[in-house]
Amino acid sequence: MTLNLRKVPAYLPGKVDGALTNLVHAAVDHVVPGLGKAEKAAAVYNIKQVVKKLGTYTEQGVKKIAKKTLGELGYLNYTPSSHLGMAITGRGTKQINMSRSTNAGGFALGGTTAAPVSISRNINRRSKPSIKMMGDAVVISHSEMLGAINSGTPSSNVTAFRCTGYRANPGMSTIFPWLSATAVNYEKYKFRRLSFTLVPLVSTNYSGRIGVGFDYDSSDLVPGNRQEFYALSNHCENMPWQESTVEIKCDNAYRFTGTHVAADNKLIDLGQVVVMSDSVSNGGTISAALPLFDLIVNYTVELIEPQQALFSSQLYSGSTTFTSGIPLGTGADTTTVVGPTVVNSTTVTNCVVTFKLPAGVFEVSYFIAWSTGTAAVVPTVPTTGAGSKLSNTSTGSNSYGVCFINSPVECDLLLTATVLLIIPTLPSSTCVFHAPARRCTTPMCHRLLTSLAG
């Protein structure tokens, strides 16, 4: 008989689940007689989850699933005596699955195992966000990939210790590239569920350690070595080719999103996630940092108290007294909203344009046009630290030039985003400087800014 779990009447789910539980218990007893109570409970739970995902089952099918699952859990060679010997001495006949039978630090509880030749891993993540209204709150569930994390700098073909921290706040685009665009429109948030997973990018011939942990004080410095990382109360450590996940314990407190200005990060952040790698080697030559794993975040978050997060700022500078000593001239500056300022340098080679922006990602454009008024003097084409396409043309009685730069800028809370324009000697001329800034919400803009490879 085949039972389809997707077609169970509404009044029967309890009875059907009970029948399935009994069937799974019988299958476990058939495959591994005498399994301990705790081990059996864990096995039954895992087998039921597999069966429910399939949607249909038969008695023989459940037995096959039970045998496969018990093998993955290392229980096929289980005997009570070998289990007791394993617990006491670390020896025995029980097979250990390194990715499952680990303590808080991700180390095996006992026994040894060789790295497999290869691992086949299917990663099924939530492809579409779930957005629901629950009372006054917007509840969002989603999965995001932050990007590849690099190892430390290698020395003698072994990478150095490297640990990086990222603040767990929905308003931070560095760690929540998709969620942050929505979260900045709300005053407060509360995580219902939060986890971080490291998905390996390397083969099984790599040795060393990688890990992911969580520090509930986001103002703390990240661990400086593996001993400090191991001291984190919530962390997972593994081989470079093994997947690692850390589940974050979420409290019931509402906190301000990243756009709120606070003297102490602990008042607005749930904490900070830290990722670590140390002594990674592949037995060959390593001449540069390696991309070791992707960092994936899964979450369910509540957002409350909507707020308007629109922002724009424009700076205009016009001058008819343009000199080489004052690259942007002495004309009046006109600003709107937040006050970007032009600071003329004491030399003719640098000019610093300073923007004060709230937290978020912004697209900043710069437009500079100049004219010498004569054909005899041709100004040198300016360059910028961000790079741009610049032009300089001489026609008739006038020499003029235009440059246009468009680049994303990210601000963490209310910090200053400084853009350096390298402007060489220019003759007296007319100059117009235009620098609008607007909040950037496009995924491409975030991808240009978010680089966790470091």
From Swiss-Prot:
What's a GO cellular component annotated to this UniProt protein?
Answer: T=3 icosahedral viral capsid
Q: Which Gene3D superfamilies match?
A: 2.60.120.20
For this protein, the record's SUPFAM superfamilies field holds:
Positive stranded ssRNA viruses
Protein name (database record):
Capsid protein
Organism equals Oat chlorotic stunt virus (isolate United Kingdom) (OCSV)
Which UniProt keywords are listed?
Capsid protein, T=3 icosahedral capsid protein, Virion
Task: List the lineage, top down.
Answer: Viruses, Riboviria, Orthornavirae, Kitrinoviricota, Tolucaviricetes
Named from the GO MF annotations, one term is: structural molecule activity
Q: Which family does it belong to?
A: Belongs to the icosahedral plant coat protein family.
